[in-house]
Amino acid sequence: MADKLTQLKALTTVVADTGDIEAIKRYQPIDATTNPSLVLKASEIPEYAALIEDAISWAKSQSQDKAQQIIDAGDKLAVNIGLEVLKIVPGRISTEVDARLSFDTEASIAKARKLIRLYNEAGIANDRILIKLASTWEGIRAAEVLEKEGIQCNLTLLFSFAQARACAEAGAFLISPFVGRILDWYKAKHNRDYTPSEDPGVVSVTAIYDYYKQHDYPTVVMGASFRNTGEILELAGCDRLTIGLPLLEELSKTEGAVVRKLNYTGERKAKPTPMSEAEFRWELNQDAMAHEKLGEGIRMFAVDQGKLETMLASRL
């Protein structure tokens, strides 16, 4: 019998949640995703030293202002890592907009255009790139504009049905609903464990997947942020799943049947009237878990972006 990773790939597009080239070569995913935390981690890999030096050299050529050089170097490093990943994966790389721009639509759009320009200048077409944006109201509005320009987006830090609905209504190419971080919140709140099938994160993604299929939204559902392989296997059949290295390794070394769990066959319904900003904010506010986890996720990515910039500043 084939290992579970091989079987899962027959049901779901498997994406590697890493910027580690050697690991990507090992597990052969279709796509790869990065975020500020993963870029920071990748920057510590000795083989990537040349990518950092190139980013710094480029930043110095763009501006005489030290603060701007730091920002430019961070953007170029994220793209440099993405370029290396694209030499390996046949599909797409997701590169994230600075989390500190999560509540600024215009700044998010400008940053996305800059990242796309850097990829384009390196010979990479838009259809191999996804721009990651936080699923705030402002991030979703930025995605709506970018999608119309041919810049496809990955809406991340998604913890609630309201966020998922708003993303679909905005025409986002893909969403990354988080599974493990939802589980973390419920375990801490209720002081109990959950089986994979009753895992609140799994239940959330399943509901979003079914809703999208029911209403014929083309937005891709890519489950993310897993804590164990049980969560992953309960979502077999999801459009895509982005998986970190430890769980990719565990799946590749485990045998046993993998069964499709997501496969909507119910009735189709007409799309509802799009949510207003007031409706979105109210529903997000009423979901304590999503409200807390969205804010926490943005803060965590901002901290790692700051650490990355501190490292780059020390080399400028």
Curated annotation (Swiss-Prot):
Active site: 132 (schiff-base intermediate with substrate)
GO cellular component: cytosol
Catalysis performed (reactions): D-sedoheptulose 7-phosphate + D-glyceraldehyde 3-phosphate = D-erythrose 4-phosphate + beta-D-fructose 6-phosphate
Pathway field: Carbohydrate degradation; pentose phosphate pathway; D-glyceraldehyde 3-phosphate and beta-D-fructose 6-phosphate from D-ribose 5-phosphate and D-xylulose 5-phosphate (non-oxidative stage): step 2/3
Species this chain originates from: Aeromonas salmonicida (strain A449)
Compartments (UniProt record): Cytoplasm
Protein name stated in the entry: Transaldolase
EC assignment: 2.2.1.2
HAMAP family with a match to the protein in the record: Transaldolase_1
